[in-house]
């Protein structure tokens, strides 16, 4: 099992897909990494040689991934909140940030519905 950037890549998957298990590396970035390192994208992770794994590690070492990337995103959101921008206010309130409507939908961002209790009718 190849371990790159502190992540165990799944053995049975192709390298191209396996690299996407690292936070900050999607399919296009994965394809670019393989093209520039010269590793065949159809190779399974379990079939990688130690030399190929080291090539991938050295290339990925220069990218902003995992903890560094998560920290940067969190700091960017924190900065927006502190300066009081519109986007920061939306983050603080837990509402959609990118202009989506909220009259209906937006349940993922707002959380489950908060039901208001209905009074029982007296006879």
From Swiss-Prot:
Coiled coil: none annotated. The lineage of its organism: Bacteria, Bacillati, Bacillota, Clostridia, Eubacteriales. InterPro entries: Rbsml_uS13_C, Ribosomal_uS13, Ribosomal_uS13-like_H2TH, Ribosomal_uS13_bac-type, Ribosomal_uS13_CS. Located at the top of the head of the 30S subunit, it contacts several helices of the 16S rRNA. In the 70S ribosome it contacts the 23S rRNA (bridge B1a) and protein L5 of the 50S subunit (bridge B1b), connecting the 2 subunits; these bridges are implicated in subunit movement. Contacts the tRNAs in the A and P-sites. GO terms for molecular function: rRNA binding; structural constituent of ribosome; tRNA binding. GO terms for biological process: translation. Part of the 30S ribosomal subunit. Forms a loose heterodimer with protein S19. Forms two bridges to the 50S subunit in the 70S ribosome. Residues 92-123 are annotated as: Disordered. The gene is rpsM. GO terms for cellular component: cytosol; small ribosomal subunit. This is Small ribosomal subunit protein uS13. Belongs to the universal ribosomal protein uS13 family. PROSITE patterns: RIBOSOMAL_S13_1 (PS00646), RIBOSOMAL_S13_2 (PS50159). Keywords: Ribonucleoprotein, Ribosomal protein, RNA-binding, rRNA-binding, tRNA-binding.
């Amino acid at each position: 099992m190849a371990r790159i950037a502190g992540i165990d890549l799944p053995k049975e998957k192709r390298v191209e897909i396996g690299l996407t298990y690292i936070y900050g590396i999607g399919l296009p970035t994965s394809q670019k990494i393989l093209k520039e390192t010269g590793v065949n994208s159809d190779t399974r992770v379990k079939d990688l040689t130690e030399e190929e794994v080291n090539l991938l590690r050295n290339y990925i070492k220069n990218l902003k991934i995992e903890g560094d990337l998560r920290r940067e995103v969190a700091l960017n959101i924190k900065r927006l909140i502190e300066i009081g921008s519109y986007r920061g206010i939306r983050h603080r309130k837990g509402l959609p940030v990118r202009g989506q409507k909220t009259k209906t939908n937006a349940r993922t961002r707002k959380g489950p519905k908060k039901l208001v209790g209905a009074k029982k009718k007296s006879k």
